[in-house]
Amino acid sequence: MDRGYRAILVGVGNIGHALMDNFSFADCGVELAAAFDIKESLIGTEFKGVPILAEAELEGYLKNNDIALAVLCVPKEVAVNVTKILTENGIEAIWNFTNMELTEPNSPIIVENVHFSDSLLSLSYFVSERMDEHTAEASRNEK
């Protein structure tokens, strides 16, 4: 990647907090500029140098800052409404951690839906394949 991007994170619950704490956005050429939440105890604080603002400030923040990417970690009940705010205010791409598929038909917005269940199912499949290989090998060795 030959240029960096500025991003915001919406939803500083378990997944959002874990991403902020453990994922190196900078190593991927992304500056996490701000995070947004509705929880009063988080608003106005900073986490790892990232200010946490009220979700009510999201639209104004996007209008006044050059932000290309959004990391979406909100409950599925509000995901569509938050996505609408993001897409109407200049966000070019969404990294979606909600537990619903986000699609933007006829939209230039890029959406990467992250599915933890798909990853777990893939792992389960590969473990099953490996166990089948071990069983077949053990059966051959018994003969």
Model-identified regions with their sequence ranges:
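A short secondary-structure junction signal
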Residues: 20-22, 47, 82
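Phosphate-bearing ligand-interacting subdomains
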Residues: 49-141
